[in-house]
Each structure stands twice: as C-alpha cells, then as structure tokens.
C-alpha cells in the first residue's frame, strides 16, 4: 500500500507543472535500479516518451535528444530484438483500438504483450458476459466499476501526495497529461470518465427510465465501489516494491488507469471550489468574456500544447470519437459531475469515506431532492467553497413567481427555472433542480455541468465561472426585454454564445413554444412577437417591467433609471438605439401620408422643411420596403432590387400605361440625406403670367442632386410642356416613363426620369412654353457626373395638331462622338429658340444614349433604346424629316447648337444667357471647345407644321455648376443669370467698377480667354464669327444639326465675320462668349447655327490627316500640333463698334474653377503679336527678338517688348490702378511706357493737376488687364491705404507694405521719378552670396582661393613696377582710392560727366526691353567733349549679357525700389555714374577699377553736364537730374552686331578735363558683363566666374 507519509493536500502545484529535466536527473541517480529492470522500466519510459512536453526555453535540439533517449529507454534495442520491439508497437496500437469501456480495466491489468492482452479480453468476455441481456449492462458496469476502484484510491492518494521524486517523475510527468487528456480528447465528450464508471451509467439510464428500484441499484453500486477499492488495496499490498523508485513506478502504473478520471476530477474540483492552488494550471481556463463556452478540454489542449494521449498511448482514434458520440449524453454529463466530487482534495484518512459516501450522496440525490450533497463534503475547505458558490447563486437569484429564493442551504444551488409554457422545458428544469450533476437538457447537452455551479434558468446551461454566467445572463436579459417592447441587437456575447451552442434546440420561445438551437435565432423570432406587442400597446402606457436579473441591474447602473432614446413620433423611450430602430418601423406607413402631404404643399407653393427630429427619425429606418416602382406599384427592400425590376419596364413598352397619371418616382436612398433630398428642400414659385418656375437657393441644388423632377405649372395665357432628360449613372437601370397624350385637349406631355443617386449633381429644369402667339423652346444640355452610362429620354410635347416628333438616339462611346442637338421652333408671329450649352468639367466615362421616340398622329409611339452596355456600338443619327408643309414661316429663329467634349474637361461652363429683352433678340452662349472632335452624325432635316416644337437634347457629360434658365440669381444690369450668389457677386463687380452710359444701345461683350493647363486641350472656335457663320441659306432654309455638316458649310463662310453685322455688334472668341443683341431690332434675324469643330483624335478617318488652322491657314499632321499652334491665336483684340463701346477681356482660372477669375493670363509679344499661355513661353520667344537690332515695332509709334517673369506675380500697384495692368504699363496721357509701376507712379505725379476722373475713364476704355477679373474688380473698390514713401507704390494692407519696405532698407537716397528698374530675363542669385574684393584692383571673386591667386599676380606686377617710379606712384593712388567708402564713391559718381547719367538711365530701359523709345541714340552718340562716344555702346552691350541673369526684379510684386548689385551705386535722381565699375559688374557693389577712381577724383574738380538729347549743358547735377526726368524713359541703345559683344571701341570713360590723357589706354572687356581689364590674364580669370 502507498505510504501515507507522502500524502499532502498542500503540494499539488508541483504536480501540475512537472519538472521534466529534474525528473531525468533523478532517474539518472540510480541507473542500475531503473535500466534493465524489465517491462516496468520500459513502460515507465514509454509513458514519459509519450507524454513529454515541449518546453520552449529548453530548446528544440535538447528536446529531440530527450525524445530519442526516452524512446531508446522504452524500446531498449540493446536488450530487445526487433520482434519484441514490433510487439511493443503493436501492443500500443491494440490498446488504442479496444472498446472504450474496456480500456480502464485493461490498463489496470497492464498487459506486457499482445498475447496477454488477448487473454485478458477473452477472460473479460467470459467473466462479465451476462446470461440475460437485461442485466448485461449493469453487470458489466459493476465489473468495470470494481476494476476501476481497484486503482482509484491509490490514485487519489498519490495524486496529492507521495515523495518528492515520485511526484515530479511519476505523476507529474505522466499522469498530469492524462489529467488533461480526458478534456482534450474531444470537445464534445467527457466520455472516458463516463465509461470508467459503468454503474453510474447504469444508474443514469435507470434514472431516465424512472425505475422504482433505483435506490437498490444505487446501494449495490456503493457496495461495488467499496469492493473495488479493497481490490485495489490488496493489489497494492501484494506487489512489494524493491525500492522507493520502484515503488513509485508501481504506484504510477496502478494510478495510470485512473489518470484521466482523476485528472478531470481534480480539475472539476478545482473549478467547483474556485480557489484551488492549481488555478493557474487548471484544465478549465476561464473565459470571462465573450461567453465562449468551447469545452474546456479543447481550450487546455490549445493553451498547453500537450500531446493528446489516450490515457497511456496519446493517440486519438476515430473510433474513440465515434464511441463518444454514441454514448449516453445524460450519463456522461452526470458521471462527470459525480466524478468531479468523488475525488476532492482531502487527507488520506478520509479516502475510503469519500469514495463510499459519494455514491451514497449521488443516490440520495434522486430520493431526497433537498439533500444534494448530504455526506459528500465533510471537509471544511470544500464546504466553504461550496457555500461561497451558493452565496453567489443566492445573491443573483430571484424567484420569478415572487416567492423568494427557493434555495435550501443543503440543496442544489439551482433556482426555479423560468416557465416558458413547454412541458419538456419544465421536465428538464425539474431534473436540474434534483441534482447538480444533472443538467436541464440531459439529452442534448454533452457538457459536464456538475463542476459548473452557475446554472442558467433560461436554457439550463451551467458555468463554472461567474463572469461567463453573467455574460450569458446578459444575453437572456436582452432577449427577455423584447417582451416589454424593447429590442436589442445581440452583442458579441450573443454571437459567441451561438458558436458555443452544442446540441439540439434548447432555446424555446415563451410565447409560441417554438424551440431554437441558437439564442440568436430565438432573439430574431421574438422580434416578431415584440412588434405585435408594440402594436397592441401602442396607445397604452406600458409599465416597464423590472427584470430581476443581475445583468439588468448592472445595466441600470450604467444607463440609470431613465432611458435615453425617445421616439419622436409616439414619445416612447428606449434604452438602446437599436430598440428605437425596431420600434420606428411601426411608423413607416405614416411616412407615405407625409409624402403625399408634402406633394400637396409643393403644389400650393409652400415650403416643406422637416424638423431635426424628423431627420433623426428618417435616419432610423431605411430597411423596410421603401423603394416602390411607380409603374406597377411593387415595393422593394433595396434599391438594387428596384433597379433590376425596372429593367422590365425599360425593355418593355413604356407607353402601355399611357392612360395613367404620371407621378414622380420616389426612390429614396438608404440614408437620411438621400431620403430628405427626395421630397424636401424645394421651394417652388409659380407665376400665373407664364414665367418660368424657380426653385430657390440651395434647395434647388440639394433637391436635384438626387433626381431631376419637373412640376407642371400652368399659366393663364400659356400652355406649358416639360421636357426632361435625366442623368443616370452607370448602374442605373430604372425605367423611364414616357406617356404620350391621349387626347388633343391634353396638351401637357412630359417625361419624368428618376434617379436615386445623390451624386447626380446636375439639376435641370426646363419649361417649354407653347402658346398660340408665342412659342419658346428652351433646350438644355444636361451634364451628368463622373461615370455615367445612362439613358437620356426626351419626350415630345404634343401640340393640338398631332405631329411626328423625332428624337434621335445614338449610343456614344467614351468621347461622345456626337454632341449635336438641334431645335427648331416655328410660331405664328414670332419664334424664339434659346439653347443653353453647358460644358461638363469632368472626364467623360460614360455613354450618351438618347431614346428614339417616334409618335404618330394617333398617339402611338415606339421607342428604341440603344444598348448602354455596348461601348463599341455606334449608331449614327438618322434622318427623319417631319412630314407636312410648313406654315406661318414669316418669322423664324433657329439656333442649332453642337456641344463638344474634351477628355480633361476642366473648363468652366458657360453662364446662362441673358433674358429676352425684345422681340427678335436672342442670346447664344457658345460652348467651350477644348479639343477638336469630328462628328459622326449625319445631316438632319427638320420641317415643321404650325405650332410644332421639336426638341433635341444634347448631352455633354461631366459636372456643371451653372444651371440653365432655372437660375435664381440674375444680374439686374445685364440680365445674365447665375446658379450661385457668389458668381453673381463676382459678376456684379463689373458693373460696380464701371457703369454703362445709360443708353440702351450699349451692351457688354465679355470675352473670356481660358488659359488651359493641359497640353492636350486646345482653343477651338477662336472667332465667334466663324462659330456663328450663316449656315442656313435663306433660299433653301437649310439647317445643320451636327458640327460635321456645320464645318462643311462653314468653309463657304470661312472669311466672314459675324461681328460685321452692325445690328449684332462684334464678338471675338474666347471660348465662351455671351452676346446680347441690341434693342430695337425690328426684324428677326436668320437662324444662327453655332458649330464647333468636333474632332476625336482617336476616331479620325484615315484620310483626314491634315489639320488646318482656321486663322492662318497652316496645316498640321498631328492634332496636338494644331492645338499648340492655336494657342497663339487664342487671344483676340477687341473691336469697338458703334453698338459696343465697352469691352472687357478677363480670364478664367482653371485651377480656381470659376470661384474667382484669378488665373494665368495670355502673354502677347508686342514685337510680333504672338500670344502665349504662359510667361515662360513668351520668355523663350523673346530671346529671338533680343538678337534683333531694333527693339521697337515697325508698325507702331510706341514700341515695346513686354519682358515677363517666369513666374509672374500679381502686381499690386497695377491692381490698384487699371492703367498699370497688363504686360505693358503705359501712361494714357502722354503714351509713355514703363516696365514697372513704380516708374509710372513717379511719372503720374506730373499729371496730378489733370482731371483724375477723366483719366480713369480713359484708362478703362483702353485697358487690357493681365490680371484676373475678380482681382481687377476688387482693385476698383478698395482704397489705396498704404503707400511706400520711397517709390510711391500703394498696398492694400500694412503687411504688404512692410514686406516692400525691406527692399529699400539700406538705400541711402530716395529714387527720383526718372528711375526705372532693370529687369533680367532670368532670376537673380538666390540669397546673399559673399564676394571677395581685391583691394588692389577692385575686382570681386566668389571664392577666397581665387582672390589669393589673384593677389599673387598683383605682387608680381608690383615687383615689375618697382623699376619705374611713376608706376609706383600710380599704384599708391590706386590703393588709396580703393579704400574709399562706397558712399563716397557714389557722391563722386554724382559729379560725373553728362553722358554717363544718360547711359545709366538708358541701361535699365534696355535691359527691360522697353520699346517705347523716342530719341534713341542710333550709335550711342551722346558723346562728351573727350571722346565718350564708345561709352554708350559699351553700356548697350549689357542687356545681352545681363539677359542671362535671373529674373531678379521682375519677380517682385511691383518691382519698385528693387535694385541689382550694380544699381546700388547709381544715382537715384538721374545723376551720372561710372558705368564700368558698378553698373557693369553684376556681382560687385560699389567696386571700381583703380583707374576709375583716379578718373573720378579728377572729375570732381571741374564738373559740367551735357544733355545729349537737347544738347543743353548744366553745371549743377541737381539741375541736370531734373532735366533728365523728361528723358528718363526714352533712351535706348542699339545692341551689338554679335550677341553679348560691344559694337564700338572700348576705352575708358573720362571727364572733359582728364579724359584726353587716358583715352588711348587699351582695355579688355568681358563679353558677358562688360567689365574692363588691363590685361588678358585678368580677363580670362574673370570670365571663369561666369562659366563656373
């Protein structure tokens, strides 16, 4: 028998985490005892081999070595033969496949080979095979119990005691994995434990049969338990161990058969007690969150990673799983619960007691329901743990009948189950009351509930951890709350419960008795009852029932007593928003009534503005059948289903339902915004005098984003027809309702298209008015958004006389080959046709399909819908002339418009035309053509009868923001309409700046020149005259509906100009021209057909390879070349006629997208007239003219070249003064031109005494602003508040002035009015670059090393000059002059001879390419008395050299007061200065040659100044400076014959007194900057600074 001294209840922690390697070291201490002992040792190592646990910190290699050693110890190849080894392996497999009920008994017998195993099995069959079948199971079970109990007590003892070595090696190493094996075998089973106790199985089955002799069988089972235990004790006494290790191994073998059982028992005991020291190693890890009640056995397998083993062999067989599935679920569950209490942790002297009394307690549970544990727990630790469990249960338990707790102190901690109306449920609940070991659903729950004291009353589930039980109760609480009108969406806990549900239908509906196997299904089912209950209790006050559940009280603690979610319709409150969502579905039917009320309000012109409460309510429900087909009335839950359904009506004949009243299709979206936009935010105004109907403000755009809907407004004097072409998206398959009229009396025909998508941002509102006296045909080109492959349906308006109307349909491909639409209208007296062309701004990704609808005189119609899905299908427009003679053709107006479309489509759409002013006046805004596209539509001839209207919709695709004719914001001055108030505000600045003279004959012609950024785009239709060429011959009345025919016809009128007509005025093309005809025209003009060249570069005919420029006749092979070429002609000059005296050219900014008109301008070369879209292009172009000898234009009195910066900045001063804007700034009084506004400001001071108002008007008449229109307009209204005191430039805010003042920070003098700034064609050097100046010669160098080498040359020269005393004296004077401060040098420069200031004054003008020269020196002949003729020529060479410098000053905002390094030495007021020293060097500031200093000292003595312009002489520099103000901007020099070279002989500039002495000295000049040097070596080294 096992020694009791090792028995201890406080030591099990070690057994749960065996130290395998310590065990190995212990085994190696006595190798003679272990190795070679025979089968005992072999079996021991076998178990260790099978149950070795991989320990990560040990490492894989050591683990492998360990496994190999254990295998060798087990098989012992040194002592065993191959046959014996094979026998061992076969025996292992045999033990695996034997029946489960025999395995414990066989393992207890420990067969050493296969023969012994077979003998045992045969003996078992003979011994336990019953004679009668009725008692076979009982007898077998008794025997199995007996055999099991032979090993159970020793196992119980040694599971908690034993010496230290045995505990580590034997039990911990081998049995502990078996502890977990029973749980890891199968997630569904506790099967091995059930089979270990066959009497328990018999008892369970007997209990299910409700046999009367249950008590007797229980007592028999108890006696068998005692007998089994005695057998085990005798067996242990018979086998005397040789030593301690052998004894431990023997005990291990005996306990091996009960390893699984004891392991589970111990685990269950731990979970039941809840405070076991082995909790960290428990086989039942707690899952407190998520209610994941995956069998704990499976969890332990995943967490521990143990090799699953079948008690002794660790191989999981399929047969075992099948046996588990076949086993009795109730017996398994109950058995496990019995076992969980059969072997609790207790002392050795109580072992026999617990083994006997446990069975007794289990039996008495069936008889005495109140004594579940009677004598089962005699030990304080267990009872304390159990009492704690019962306390928890009591704390959370409430009797649903209101009788209080039904828990007895000694009874099972189960509360009375919740009655659901099911007898089966009651029976299960009663069984759960009887015993802790019997779950409610004994047949369907294969989980061991005995060790789980927390039992759910709803479903009978048991839980071992309180947190899991609470989570589970939360789920039931949510389900139960449905009964009280509150619905919940089951949380993650419920979803986890669904995963853990095992077994049959265990969730039963309390209302109808239906059962479900998942709680989620039951929750969904209860929603049905909850909705019905809510309907019944809708108008009643239902008390909130208190659910006596701990989880509900927890919810109350979280949310409080008040519920937060209130139904705004019926004021019912809910705890969760999901409950409110479910509740609000009841009110869904009320919405339809509201919708009809909204329609009535709209008919009355009232405004419906839903409250925020309704908005929130509409957000809540979106899943009922909200999508109704207006054709057949069928409703759908999803919009996609409706789309699929509407295919049927689209493919069918939409005219079948022509007798029905056409209603608006209401297809709400799934969100609040989509839903709201369908029926609110519409404020319609109906005017009974026949005017258009409008939708106010943002309500129009919001409403029409979803769909385009037309409301019919009937006037007194007019009959109106709404023709609508709705945009659709790619997936739009909704039907289109086109209902012709049944009778002649009904003259209102309209087509309604519905579009449920929010991204349809293009509202279109068309009202076609038909009247006896007047007919208006308003046709809108609709644009859709992004990817649109849609239908576009046009329904003909039916006049009294039944007419045939043809609306051509074609399926356009990606580039929309055909963008042509035509409209002709004929009236009895006057016909007007207005076409709004709206160009889209996004790339076309869709097709344009127009349905071909033909209506005969009987009202019959047929429709041909192009296949929208076939991108390659090309259907040309067909000819379908209208039959019948034409009547009342006295006056006709026909405007046929073709709209082109480009790929990028980044242009802004044209604004709507002005309103009708007088009879015969019409406005035709031309479309913005970005790329040439060839039309593929054939010619269409349309003839009309009287009172007939034919409508052709032309659909360019893309996003547009200007709405045609439905625009609310109309300019009161010119009648132009805008979609947004901001656009109107920007537009009205034009009128604020300048008002017309008041005459009705003055009209504005606004030419917008678009500067594209995409090189693929082009400026087609440059001249508005060619777009409006007369394409209809009066004799034949021929109409052209497509641009292809129009282009053909335009060749005839290629040279005509539409502005030649005096009545129409003249408009030049800027891509978008709004022309409003003058008043007083008494006759109706002939039709104007504006056509745009529509050429698709990818769809060109193979023969069309030459693209001709319409302006100059040049031909190009590639369309892109023509596009680039036409940019030259894109900017047109204004033509002032008698009717149009004010013209404004402004630009649109593509990047700003029409919010403002600030953008890149077109830059025109004044030399040749060529225009460029970017200043860099003009910069490159003007380099050609820089090499010309003359800078002035031949045909102009004032010649100039506008040198523009690479990145032009807005000139603030130019913005303030309109006269300063543009590429050339000129004085409007005297015509004098300036490069920068600072010079002009100084010049304008001379004209202050003049009338400023008159000058401003003159400036505005001749202005060609280069800045954006909005910036220009803003400049007219803002006051010039901050003015620079140095240069006179004005700024809007002090910040700009502060930035500007920094330019003049270190300038000693104020600039005079004669100062003009020097501009470079390239940017100056960024930042301050240090210069190293040679004090000997005044030269500057970038690097100090170059200066050092340069000084060495001076040393050598000084050594050479020491021979001559005269040379040494001259060198000393040079040294003295070099150190003279820069300010002194400037003062000295003020006394320079008269020719030098003239040269310096002319130098900036040459470099800035000022063409306005009045008295240019042809050869630089402003010669002084001492031979200074070459000096101006030397200076004239500077522009060529300095042209390579960066754009320094031109980049400044206004260029005022900014000077280059050499200009720092200039006299601001026109005083003369040395050109070589400072002006010639771009790097040096105030640096001069030694000789120059000497000259200046001499010049100070006898100064006098000669003016080369008027040959006047001055002795005072101030007087001479004032005189030069009149010539400041008029001096220019001819360039050299060669680029960068001087054309004259270079000699030193000198004064009249000292010039003759040094006139013969020879110098070497730098070709780049013009600096002079004494020797070639110095020149070569200097030139290295330019080359880098």
Curated annotation (Swiss-Prot):
Residues 128-230, 266-306, 319-349, 588-610, 838-930, 1056-1104, 1395-1495 are annotated as: Disordered. InterPro entries: Krueppel_C2H2_ZnFinger, SCAN_dom, SCAN_sf, Znf_C2H2_sf, Znf_C2H2_type. A zinc finger (C2H2-type) spans 454-476, 507-529, 565-587, 627-649, 969-991, 1107-1129, 1163-1185, 1225-1247, 1282-1304, 1332-1354, 1505-1527, 1564-1586. Residues 143-152, 161-182, 206-225, 295-306, 588-607, 868-881, 1071-1082 have a biased composition (Basic and acidic residues). Residues 1397-1417 are annotated as: 3 X 7 AA repeat of P-E-V-E-A-A-E. It holds the Pfam family SCAN. Residues 46-128 form the SCAN box domain. Residues 129-142, 1395-1415, 1449-1466, 1475-1495 have a biased composition (Acidic residues). GO terms for molecular function: DNA-binding transcription factor activity, RNA polymerase II-specific; RNA polymerase II cis-regulatory region sequence-specific DNA binding; zinc ion binding. Transmembrane segments: none annotated. Its main location: nucleus. It is found in: Nucleus; Cytoplasm. Residues 1418-1443 are annotated as: 4 X 5 AA repeat of P-X-G-E-A. CDD domains: SCAN. Sequence repeats lie at residues 1397-1403, 1404-1410, 1411-1417, 1418-1422, 1425-1429, 1432-1436, 1439-1443. GO terms for biological process: apoptotic process; regulation of transcription by RNA polymerase II. Gene3D superfamilies: Classic Zinc Finger, DNA breaking-rejoining enzymes. One of its GO terms (cellular component) is nucleus. Keywords: Apoptosis, Cytoplasm, Metal-binding, Nucleus, Repeat, Zinc, Zinc-finger. Belongs to the krueppel C2H2-type zinc-finger protein family. Homodimer. Interacts with SIAH1A and SIAH2. Interacts with TRAF2. PANTHER family: IP01015P-RELATED. The SCAN domain enables PEG3 homo- or heterodimerization to control gene expression in a combinatorial fashion. Induces apoptosis in cooperation with SIAH1A. Acts as a mediator between p53/TP53 and BAX in a neuronal death pathway that is activated by DNA damage. Acts synergistically with TRAF2 and inhibits TNF induced apoptosis through activation of NF-kappa-B. This is Paternally-expressed gene 3 protein. It comes from Pan troglodytes (Chimpanzee). The gene is PEG3.
